[in-house]
Regions:
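Glycine-rich loop-to-alpha-helix module at the N-terminal edge of alpha/beta enzyme cores
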Residues: 3-68
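Generic short alpha-helical hydrophobic face used as a protein-protein interaction/packing hotspot
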Residues: 18, 62, 96, 165-169
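Short, solvent-exposed coil/turn elements at secondary-structure transition points
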Residues: 50, 154-156, 169
Length: 169
C-alpha cells in the first residue's frame, strides 16, 4: 500500500523531495504563470503571485523534519510524564476553487505530503492545468507515483463520489 510506504519514508528523504519540488517550481515559474494566465485570465504578475504564495508553504514544508520530532515532558505531575508523537494520518483530500489554481492546491498538499500522507486533489474544472503540472513536478522531484493524485470532473459528481469513497475507508 503506497500510503504505508510513503508514511514510513524517512522524514529527511521526504524533505529532500520537497526541496527538489521547490526548485522545480522556481525553475518553471514563468511557464506555470503563462499557463495560469492563459487558462484563468489573470495577468502574468498576478499569476506569478499565485504560484509564489503557494511556494511559500512548500518552503515551510521543506523544514518539516524538525516539526515531526514530537515532545517529551518529564515530571509533568506527580508520577506523570508526557510524550507526544506525530504520525501521518493517511490519505488527505482537497477540492480547490478556480480563483487561485496554483496557490490553494500547494497550501493543501504541501504539508500533507511532507508529513507522510498521500493526497487526492480535485482541482476546479475551470482551470485544472497548473494543478496537473504541479503533480507532474512532484513526481519529477522524486515523489513516488500515487503520492499526489489528481482527479477531474464535474464538481458535484466528483465531490459525492470521493466523499463517499473516503468515508468508507
Amino acid at each position: 500500500m503506497l500510503f504505508r510506504s510513503w508514511a514510513t519514508t524517512n522524514p529527511q528523504r521526504r524533505a529532500r523531495v520537497m526541496f527538489e519540488f521547490k526548485r522545480l517550481i522556481e525553475r518553471d515559474m514563468n511557464t506555470l504563470a503563462e499557463i495560469l494566465s492563459s487558462e484563468h485570465g489573470k495577468v502574468i504578475a498576478d499569476s506569478k503571485g499565485d504560484i509564489q504564495r503557494g511556494l511559500e508553504v512548500i518552503e515551510f514544508a521543506c523544514g518539516i523534519p524538525h516539526m515531526l520530532k514530537g515532545e517529551y515532558t518529564e515530571g509533568a505531575g506527580p508520577g506523570i510524564d508526557i510524550m507526544s508523537m506525530r504520525q501521518p494520518l493517511g490519505v488527505a483530500a482537497g477540492i480547490t476553487p478556480f480563483n487561485f489554481p496554483g496557490m490553494i492546491p500547494m497550501w493543501m498538499f504541501g504539508i500533507a505530503i511532507a508529513t507522510g500522507n498521500t493526497f487526492l486533489l480535485k482541482p476546479s474544472e475551470k482551470d485544472p492545468t497548473v494543478p496537473v503540472r504541479l503533480a507532474e513536478l512532484m513526481m519529477e522531484a522524486g515523489a513516488p507515483s500515487g503520492v499526489l493524485n489528481v482527479v477531474h470532473g464535474d464538481k458535484t459528481a466528483r465531490s459525492e463520489e470521493h466523499t463517499s469513497e473516503l468515508q468508507s475507508h
